């Protein structure tokens, strides 16, 4: 047997030659003796009922299970072997028996016994007429056999043969002796083909069988060969098709008996006349196997040819048989050419390289791909110049330095289409422009300095900003922005003294996104800049994937923007990332154990799939479902490795990816999915690495393992292995399997191997289950099952145990004699136990005594230390006495420390803690803890839910202690629940208590342990669930949880559950009556320590609380309102910002709201957790109030949990900063928010057209501004329209109108009205249809003269000059 790892030969890109000039690609996967086939001449093919393929060759019968070929040959010493190794025909009957015809004898193969029964010609009348068997067919429970000397019919009941011979004198006999084909049509007619014609059975009785020979009209163009029929088949319309040797193809229409030559059909004239086999595929196309290859007659009449010259015996040429399997794949057997498989999925990917017949590349290494608008595709190779392919004409031409003048290099790194020309970037030469229409290189006179830059470093990437501006990414000199018209350029490098700074000068990729941002990926980091800043003296460049301290970063290979405008980044060896607002998140690309770390290029199809090229093949990543599929060479790719940015989406339907081995092309919507998932077959059973024969000395197998349902094994045979396979022949190396041995294991073992090994040590009944998935991850619905019984060893048999019982009984009788002495010993031990318990009680009493004494000592000791320390501070006496006082203080402190340690130990022993409870929303608290396990739940595929009857339930609780309880309970739930299980945190209440249930579907807890689980150091034994090896803990978690719950005057208990799993319920009293005043703290929030911010500053701000200078406001400064209940932090932030901004302060949200309404600050910075009014509520009120809705709000809190962040953003916050924050970043983010507001105001004045959403930050402002625009538009020609009318129509006071307009646009209401009127006037002037005086009145000006004055002030030119300028443009 030979093992098939991957299909060894891919017959790629057989160009289908159509008589109507169609171009198609048929990709076959071939099997030869190298892959395990017994011989390369394949004569016949059959598939059995369990899916295995049987292949007959000139040297052996082959059984192929999708993984392994098993060969059957004649063995002269074995009468149960096949009669001859030269196979001519194969057929399976209804009972599953396989009939095999050879050059010497007929064979019936029993797959259950794995044996052949032979039949030969003899002198008996009921034997075969010949030993050479050419055709086999089961008809009506009989086997019809075509031989070299007539027809034989085998009766299964009598086990005898009836011979039908040819007789020239009898017209009702066979027309020829050599029977080559037998066929039964759907209407029950039986047709027999011979070497001298075709006949149809017309009658049959016990004495005679009569046939009608079918007449045919000879074709004058065909040489007068006799009609040698080779194959017969029926189409869906019940027409018969007849293949003949040297006479071509014939057809018999349904319900007729006339042979019509199909060779007369115009599109069929060039089809070879020597047809050996025909068959239909699942699309009703007729496959015609000839001695010059395969012709495919499509349902629309077109004919395609696949093959080679008739003199070529190799490969897919001299076809002997064609077979369509259960999946619909087509198999072809050729003479000395092997076995060939065609499936639609073979053509999923089309490959091109230097050896391709269509689109032959000039060089294999393809580094860049580009396409023009008129169906030209350009492949830039790294050694052969450019290959240009014309899709319309199917022609390729090569462009290189040898045939094109001025073509500077054949090592092409980048291509970009601009204005019907191709920018070419190459290795160590200048970039140049190739005109593919004139087939010439255009000259481009770069400045000398720029030429030197290009020569020093290669151009690795070219990007188009517009028709005149091109970006070049160089590998050593940074990025170049070049204006082809002015010849000016800007160079971006890492030079610190330059205006611009990149992370690295080696630019691999360059991309301009839809937001007009330029992304520059380098060998060390990613850079992004806005094109709007390109003309500024200093351009801000943001850096990602770069450590400025180490001056090192990630190697960026490609940048891509999807249809949702998300930015994706592929790196070298560091993974795949997506841009989320301000940061990049890593996307794990992993499937079936294959992990992708390098992404070279990205494309998106019409179905929201990203296609990534990597070093492991091509990856399909669905943006919606996150499903991942990886295609590699076993799926038909030319290579698993690809080059950076070497990809193309051609016409939005065809993708190209280039690599070091060539180019792969495919249409994403045409990739075929294999849904065929046959049952797994058991192929071998081995004991101690030896195959178990059928029968044998131990009689373990009575029939083949594929048909065996149960096996009995002795104890010494329990070291065994089982081999299996799934008969999926499409990329079979990608098949997967999952198996388990019930009784030994519950979990499935997933593998691509086809063998499972076991050593069973315990006698018993076991069940082996195995299921499989095909190459496209389609799994079986039902597993294949094998029941295995392992018998015990003799010393563990029933009679052995009887003997053991007898011995034990005798021993028991002997033991009775000293039971009394044992009872005495037991009594003694009981007394010792009582004594031990008494000693423990004494020890506890002693410990309690020492604790009480410690309490008594601590109070006077504290009273001693206080005055003593005051004495030391005030003491002015002798130094000698002062030293003695210091000795007293040190000794007292040491004694206090020892007492505290003793008390802490006692507290731990008794689980007595001081409760520090505060009222809080326990739902939010529990949801925080719930979120902590969300990622773990997702990774383990748990169904993890949170349920609460209310969003707010206020309870007095100690957060730090109660947190320990629920973390313990939830972590236990995950620990003892298998992956894929259910875990729920549910909150309910009644009038007195709140109940928190942790419900899981795990292994549960046995009744015998339920009363012990809260004991300290007790653990549920591992055998509570023997099939799982759970991690063990310390055994104190539940005990501590119980103590904490009781400390809250609550309980924790195990709730009875009908289904498997566990429910722990924590009950806590509502209200505060159950707690003492000492157990309640007034402020639950921890104080903010400003020292963590001070250490970030080189010079500390002076922490003055209030000064006269702080009360003085400067009009040119923005005003910031700081809302923080923690005064030291509030003062710190104030002093941090007061040099740049006017500062207002508030200690809670209630005060802040009033200050905001009175002073209308430029920005509000607010804590979240505060008394009176929390920050999120303050934010909501600010955003809901029309007076203050325009003010940006920044939420500042020490909580970093997602729940608080979501709540803050939902309330309308513009920014969210977690404490502790970075001082530098804090200042920068405040500055950016305020500068952004100023830019929005400036935008109103500078832009001709603008929408309210572009200059507002809240929906209320946007609606109000829309209304303001509409009011001014409606009153455009109204000269009487003033601020009073404006405020009345808008529905706000004049003060509010002034504040809102000023906040939005930096204008007064009058200026706002005039600004809109002047912009409308400019629009009217641009049309050049109305005179200036009319326009001035139409836009509400009383005087054309005043209008001209205002217009010139706004646009720096008179209305007439403005109008003339636009008229000149037209």
From Swiss-Prot:
Report which reactions are catalysed by this protein. ATP + protein L-histidine = ADP + protein N-phospho-L-histidine
Q: What domain of life does the UniProt record list for this protein's source?
A: Bacteria
**Modifications the protein undergoes after translation, according to the UniProt entry:** Autophosphorylated. Activation requires a sequential transfer of a phosphate group from a His in the primary transmitter domain, to an Asp in the receiver domain and to a His in the secondary transmitter domain.
Which Pfam families does the record match to this protein? Answer: HATPase_c, HisKA, HTH_18, Reg_prop, Response_reg, Y_Y_Y
According to its UniProt record, the EC number is 2.7.13.3
Q: What class of enzyme is it?
A: transferase
* UniProt membrane topology term: Single-pass membrane protein
| InterPro entries, per the entry | CheY-like_superfamily, HATPase_C_sf, His_kinase_dom, HisK_dim/P_dom, HisK_dim/P_sf, Homeodomain-like_sf, HTH_AraC, HTH_AraC-typ_CS
Q: Which GO terms describe its cellular component?
A: cell surface; membrane
Annotated Response regulatory domain residues: 1119-1234
Q: Which GO terms describe its molecular function?
A: DNA-binding transcription factor activity; phosphorelay sensor kinase activity; sequence-specific DNA binding
Q: Where is the signal peptide?
A: 1-20
Sites where Phosphohistidine occurs are at: 855
Residue ranges constituting the Histidine kinase domain according to the UniProt record: 852-1072
| Name of the featured protein | Histidine kinase P4
| Organism the protein comes from | Formosa agariphila (strain DSM 15362 / KCTC 12365 / LMG 23005 / KMM 3901 / M-2Alg 35-1)
């Amino acid at each position: 047997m030979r093992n098939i790892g991957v299909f060894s030969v891919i017959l790629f890109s057989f160009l289908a030659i159509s008589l109507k000039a169609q171009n198609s690609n048929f990709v076959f996967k071939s099997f030869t003796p190298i892959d395990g086939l017994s011989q390369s001449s394949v004569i016949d093919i059959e598939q059995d009922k369990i899916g295995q393929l049987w292949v007959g060759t000139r040297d052996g019968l082959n059984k192929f299970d999708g993984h392994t070929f098993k060969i059957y040959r004649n063995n002269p010493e074995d009468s149960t072997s096949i009669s001859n190794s030269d196979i001519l025909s194969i057929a399976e009957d209804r009972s599953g028996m396989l009939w095999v015809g050879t050059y010497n004898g007929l064979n019936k193969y029993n797959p259950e016994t794995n044996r052949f029964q032979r039949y030969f010609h003899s002198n008996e009348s009921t034997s075969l007429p010949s030993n050479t068997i050419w055709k086999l067919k089961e008809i009506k429970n009989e086997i019809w056999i075509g031989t070299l000397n007539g027809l034989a019919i085998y009766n299964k009941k009598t086990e005898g043969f009836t011979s039908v011979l040819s007789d020239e004198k009898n017209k009702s006999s066979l027309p020829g002796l050599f029977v080559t084909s037998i066929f039964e049509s759907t209407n029950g007619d039986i047709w027999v083909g011979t070497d001298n014609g075709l006949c149809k059975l017309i009658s049959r009785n016990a004495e005679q069988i009569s046939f009608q020979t079918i007449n045919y009209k000879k074709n004058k163009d065909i040489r007068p060969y006799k009609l040698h029929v080779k194959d017969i088949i029926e189409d869906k319309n019940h027409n018969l098709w007849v293949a003949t040797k040297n006479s071509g193809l014939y057809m018999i229409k349904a319900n007729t008996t006339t042979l019509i030559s199909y060779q007369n059909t115009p599109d069929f004239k060039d089809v070879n006349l020597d047809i050996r086999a025909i068959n239909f595929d699942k699309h009703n196309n007729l496959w015609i196997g000839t001695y010059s290859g395969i012709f495919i007659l499509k349902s629309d009449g077109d004919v395609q040819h696949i093959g080679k010259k008739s003199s070529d015996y190799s490969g897919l040429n001299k076809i002997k048989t064609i077979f369509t399997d259960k999946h619909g794949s087509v198999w072809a057997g050729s003479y000395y050419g092997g076995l060939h498989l065609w499936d639609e999925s073979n053509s999923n990917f089309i490959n091109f390289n230097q050896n391709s017949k269509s689109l032959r590349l000039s060089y294999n290494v393809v580094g860049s791909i580009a396409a023009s608008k008129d169906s030209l595709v350009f492949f830039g190779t790294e050694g052969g110049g450019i290959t240009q392919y014309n899709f319309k004409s199917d022609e390729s031409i090569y462009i290189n330095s040898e045939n094109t003048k001025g073509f500077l290099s054949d090592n092409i790194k980048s291509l970009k289409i601009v204005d019907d020309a191709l920018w070419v970037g190459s290795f160590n030469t200048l970039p140049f422009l190739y005109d593919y229409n004139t087939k010439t290189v255009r000259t481009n006179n770069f400045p000398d300095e720029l030429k030197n830059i290009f020569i020093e470093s290669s151009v690795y990437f070219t990007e188009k900003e517009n028709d005149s501006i091109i970006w070049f990414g160089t590998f050593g000199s940074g990025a170049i922005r070049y204006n082809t018209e002015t010849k000016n350029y800007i160079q971006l490098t890492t030079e610190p003294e330059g205006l611009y700074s990149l992370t690295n000068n080696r630019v691999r990729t360059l991309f301009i996104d839809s937001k007009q941002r330029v992304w520059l990926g380098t060998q060390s980091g990613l850079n992004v800049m806005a094109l709007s800043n390109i003309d500024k003296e200093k351009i801000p460049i943001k850096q990602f994937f770069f450590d400025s301290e180490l001056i090192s970063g990630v190697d960026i290979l490609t940048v891509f923007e999807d249809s949702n405008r998300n930015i994706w980044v592929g790196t070298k060896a560091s993974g795949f990332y997506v841009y989320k607002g301000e940061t990049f998140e890593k996307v794990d690309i992993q499937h079936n154990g294959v992990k992708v770390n390098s992404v070279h290029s990205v494309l998106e199809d019409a179905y929201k799939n990203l296609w990534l090229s990597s070093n492991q093949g091509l990856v399909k990543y669905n943006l919606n479902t996150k499903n991942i599929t990886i295609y590699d060479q076993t799926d038909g790719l030319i290579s698993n490795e690809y080059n950076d940015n070497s990809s193309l989406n051609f016409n939005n339907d065809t993708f190209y990816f280039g690599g070091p081995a060539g180019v792969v092309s495919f249409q994403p919507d045409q990739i075929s999915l294999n849904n065929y998932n046959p049952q797994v077959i058991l192929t071998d059973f081995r004991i101690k690495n030896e195959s178990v024969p059928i029968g044998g000395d131990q009689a373990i197998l009575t029939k083949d393992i594929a048909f065996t349902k149960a096996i009995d094994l002795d104890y010494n045979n329990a070291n065994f292995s089982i081999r299996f396979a799934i008969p999926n022949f499409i990329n079979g190396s990608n098949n997967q399997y999952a198996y388990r041995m019930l009784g030994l294991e519950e979990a499935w073992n997933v593998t691509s191997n086809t063998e499972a090994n076991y050593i069973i040590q315990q006698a018993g009944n076991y069940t082996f289950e195995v299921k499989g998935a095909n190459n496209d991850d389609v799994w079986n619905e039902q597993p294949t099952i094998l029941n295995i019984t392992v018998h015990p060893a003799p010393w563990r048999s029933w009679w052995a145990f009887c003997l053991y019982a007898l011995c034990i009984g005798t021993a028991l009788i002997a033991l009775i004699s000293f039971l009394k002495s044992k009872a005495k010993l037991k009594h003694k031990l009981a007394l010792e136990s009582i004594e031990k318990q008494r000693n423990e009680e004494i020890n506890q009493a002693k410990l309690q005594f020492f604790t009480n004494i410690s309490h008594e000592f601590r109070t006077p000791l504290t009273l001693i230390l206080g005055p003593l320390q005051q004495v030391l501070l005030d003491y002015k006496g002798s130094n000698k006495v002062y030293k003695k006082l210091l000795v007293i203080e040190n000794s007292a402190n040491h004694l206090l420390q020892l007492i505290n340690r003793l008390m802490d130990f006692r507290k731990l022993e008794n689980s007595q803690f001081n409760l520090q409870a505060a009222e809080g929303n326990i739902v939010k608290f529990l949801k925080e803890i719930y979120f902590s396990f969300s990622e773990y739940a997702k990774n383990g595929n748990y169904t993890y839910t949170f349920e609460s009857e209310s969003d707010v339930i206020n309870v007095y609780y100690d957060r730090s202690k109660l947190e320990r309880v629920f973390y313990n309970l939830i972590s236990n739930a995950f620990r003892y629940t298998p992956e894929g299980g259910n875990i729920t945190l549910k909150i309910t209440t009644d009038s007195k208590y709140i109940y928190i249930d942790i419900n899981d579907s795990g292994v549960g807890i046995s009744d015998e342990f339920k009363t012990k689980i809260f004991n300290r150091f007790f653990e549920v034994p591992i055998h509570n669930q023997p099939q799982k090896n759970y991690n063990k803990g310390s055994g104190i978690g539940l005990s501590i949880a119980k103590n904490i719950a009781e400390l809250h005057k609550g309980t924790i208990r195990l709730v009875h559950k009908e289904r498997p799993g566990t429910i722990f319920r924590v009950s806590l009293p509502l209200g505060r009556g159950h707690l003492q005043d000492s157990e309640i703290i007034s402020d639950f929030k921890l104080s903010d320590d400003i020292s963590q911010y001070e250490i970030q500053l080189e010079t500390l701000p002076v922490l003055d609380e209030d000064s006269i200078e702080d009360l003085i406001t400067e009009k040119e400064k923005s005003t910031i309102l700081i809302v923080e209940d923690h005064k030291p932090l509030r003062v710190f932030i104030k002093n941090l910002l007061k040099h740049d901004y006017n500062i207002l302060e508030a200690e809670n949200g209630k005060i802040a709201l009033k200050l905001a309404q009175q002073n209308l600050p430029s920005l509000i910075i607010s804590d979240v957790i505060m008394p009176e009014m929390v920050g999120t509520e303050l934010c909501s009120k600010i955003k809901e109030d029309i007076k203050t809705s325009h003010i940006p709000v920044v939420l500042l809190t020490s909580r970093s949990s997602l729940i608080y962040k979501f709540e803050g953003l939902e309330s309308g916050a513009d920014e969210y900063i977690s404490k502790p924050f970075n001082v530098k970043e804090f200042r920068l983010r405040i500055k950016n928010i305020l500068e952004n507001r100023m830019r929005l105001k400036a935008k109103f004045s500078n832009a001709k057209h603008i929408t309210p959403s572009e200059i507002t930050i809240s929906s209320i402002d946007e609606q109000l501004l829309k209304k303001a625009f509409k009011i001014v538009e409606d009153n455009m020609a109204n000269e009487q329209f003033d601020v009073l009318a404006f405020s009345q129509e808008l529905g706000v006071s004049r003060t509010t109108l002034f504040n809102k307009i000023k906040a939005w646009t930096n204008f007064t209401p009058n200026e706002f009205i005039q600004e809109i009127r002047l912009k409308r006037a400019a629009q009217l002037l641009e049309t050049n249809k109305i005179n200036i005086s009319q326009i001035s009145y139409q836009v509400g000006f009383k005087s054309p003269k005043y209008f001209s004055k205002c217009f010139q002030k706004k646009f720096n030119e008179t209305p007439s000059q403005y109008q003339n300028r636009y008229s000149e443009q037209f």
